A protein has these predicted regions:
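Residue-level signal for inorganic ion chemistry
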Residues: 88, 209, 234
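Conserved SAM/SAH cofactor-binding pocket of Class I
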Residues: 96-166
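Extended basic-aromatic, gly/pro-enriched interface segments that bind polyanionic ligands
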Residues: 134-210, 214-222, 247-249, 267
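A short glycine-rich, Lys/Arg-flanked "PGG" loop and its adjoining helix->strand segment in the class I
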Residues: 224-236
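Conserved beta-strand signature within the Rossmann-like core of class I S-adenosyl-L-methionine
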Residues: 237-244
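Short proline/glycine-enriched turn/loop segments at secondary-structure junctions
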Residues: 251-255
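Short hydrophobic/aromatic beta-strand or adjacent loop that forms the aromatic wall/cage
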Residues: 259-263
Length: 267
């Protein structure tokens, strides 16, 4: 069977429908390379049919986690693209505090993966003196990734961008310095939630939303839908940050204004 025919076959359509039913994931929203990753995993496990592969990931948490991991290339670290983070710390958060007249800002890491991004946001929240009673929302479709994030334990190489003063203040060393654990103060500043950004309703009134290196895997139509939802989730004057390889081409049609590289705002 040719590759394209496999992707449009009734068997593959049935696989996608059942997958959406059990984990809320719509593969129709993903680019075509996702299909190749499905076949790569089927080959790895020696599974010949879509029905057999569906039953495999339905009944084996390890294989389901591997499947979710392979939908995207999960490269995550603290303060990734650090210039964005220091702009948030030095300009955006202080500006929002002045505009709002208080330190209760709503912050959201959408597609939080294993937690490096929301914990980075929580550290800046502490550094800037934001009210800890308004935690950072961290949302992801992968419950396995969320479980890892909630533990808050990371390898040294994931912390290369963390300033030494933050490392000393907000982390505890483990295993002779090979791993680090986020301290309790920062953990309390983050609320994790399983979330399907395609199907689930977004909240609103957010001051800063980060969705970096997630939307790039979706089709153009799904991207546009999501960007509109993110715009509506922002409070007036709020900021939306995307990844360093991303650009919203029709941002003006969606209501955004560009506020800097990979940075958009709702006026």
């Amino acid at each position: 069977m040719e590759e394209q025919n496999q992707y449009t076959s009734p068997e593959y359509e049935g696989f996608k429908q059942k997958l959406r039913k059990i984990i809320g994931l719509d593969l129709n929203s993903y680019k075509n390379q996702i299909h190749r990753r499905v076949h790569m995993l089927m080959d790895r496990w020696g599974v010949k049919t879509y029905d057999d592969y569906f039953n495999t990931i339905k009944n084996d948490d390890k294989k389901l986690r591997e499947f979710l991991d392979h939908l995207t290339i999960n490269v995550s670290e603290f303060f990734r693209n650090d210039k964005q983070w220091w702009k948030m710390r030095d300009e955006l958060i202080p500006e929002l505090i002045r505009k709002r007249g208080n330190k209760r800002l709503k912050l959201w890491s959408a597609g939080c993966a294993t937690g490096e991004e929301p914990y980075s946001l929580a550290i800046l929240s502490a550094v800037c003196g934001l009210d800890a009673s308004t935690p950072v929302l961290a949302a992801d479709i992968d419950q396995g990734a969320i479980a890892i994030a909630q533990k808050g334990i990371y390898l040294k190489r994931q912390l290369l961008n963390v300033p030494q003063e933050y490392l000393a203040k907000y982390f505890t060393t483990r295993d002779g310095g090979e791993t680090y654990e986020v301290n309790a103060e920062i953990k309390r500043r983050v609320t994790f939630k399983r979330f399907n950004m395609i199907d689930d309703a977004f909240g609103n009134g957010f001051d800063i939303v980060l969705c970096r290196n997630v939307v790039i895997y979706f089709t153009t139509a799904t991207k546009s839908l999501l960007y509109v939802k993110f715009f509506n989730a922002l409070a007036p004057g709020g900021y939306f940050l995307v990844g360093s390889t991303e650009q919203i081409f029709d941002y003006k049609k969606m209501g955004f204004e560009m506020a800097g590289p990979f940075l958009y705002t709702r006026k």
